[in-house]
Amino acid sequence: MKLIEELFDLRGKVAAITGGARGIGAETARTLAAAGATVAILDVLSQEAEALVAEIRAQGGEAVYWWLDVTREADVARVFGEIASRFGRLDVLVNNAGIDGPNRPTHELTLEQWQRVQDVNVNGVFLCTRAAIPHLEAAGGGSVVNLSSMYGIVGGPDVPAYHASKAAVRMMAKVDAMLYAAKNIRANSVHPGYIRTPMLEEAFRHMGQDPDAAFDYMQTHVPLGKIGSPRDIAAGILYLVSPAGRYVTGAELVIDGGYTAR
């Protein structure tokens, strides 16, 4: 048991999670806090984020919320400075904030629709990583995790702006892994498959589909025969940012129930 505790011990570490108020981000915040990390939850969803902070604190963890739109350059720089100033360090960045965008074929997308997805999903990752790197270096090293998707690796006949953005952050993690390895900063990407999240449920409703029926259909395409949960992804992120993952950088952690192995 002692070995397990040592492998996943995040006591004394500070983790910033973008899009941390719900779904995968919220479950990651709970998981890292349970491992001992102080968690900075960054999101535009104030009500959900404040409730999550209260939940984590009630369970003996430490969490603080900052309102942040990851597309706002000055705000990103300010918030990361405030995190480092308040806690004295930053050790982990989880780039989770993202949107899906319109489910239209490429020739029907407007440039504005395309750009909005890239602004959040790609530029947001760039801005937050850029702001975090000096603080990670000052802490003696750290870990960056970019939330990509299984569709950042394989193609799919829908939401082209989203899929392109997820391929971009996959490569950004590889480049940053090479750039900052000498500073003991690791960078990896996580590639969820079909995960039941509020964002995906809302996407189905927007398309006029019943989420339960949609997930039932989707799981027939998954070798394990079931839809994943945010906890499945949070567990993978915990591995990457903890001592257990100390020799892992530039890697792709695919958590998709076997979908991309077909």
PLM region spans:
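Alpha-helical segment proximal to the catalytic Tyr-Lys
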Residues: 134, 178-179, 246
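Substrate-binding pocket helix/loop in short-chain dehydrogenase/reductase
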Residues: 104-106, 110-115, 218
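C-terminal substrate-recognition "lid" of short-chain dehydrogenase/reductases
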Residues: 2, 137, 226-255, 260
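Short, small/polar-rich loop/turn modules that mediate ligand/substrate recognition or access, typified
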Residues: 89, 181, 186, 248-250
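Residue(s) in the substrate-gating loop at a strand-loop-helix junction
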Residues: 149
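Active-site helix of classical SDR
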Residues: 129, 165, 173
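Canonical Rossmann dinucleotide-binding motif of NAD(H)/NADP(H)-dependent dehydrogenases/reductases
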Residues: 9-39
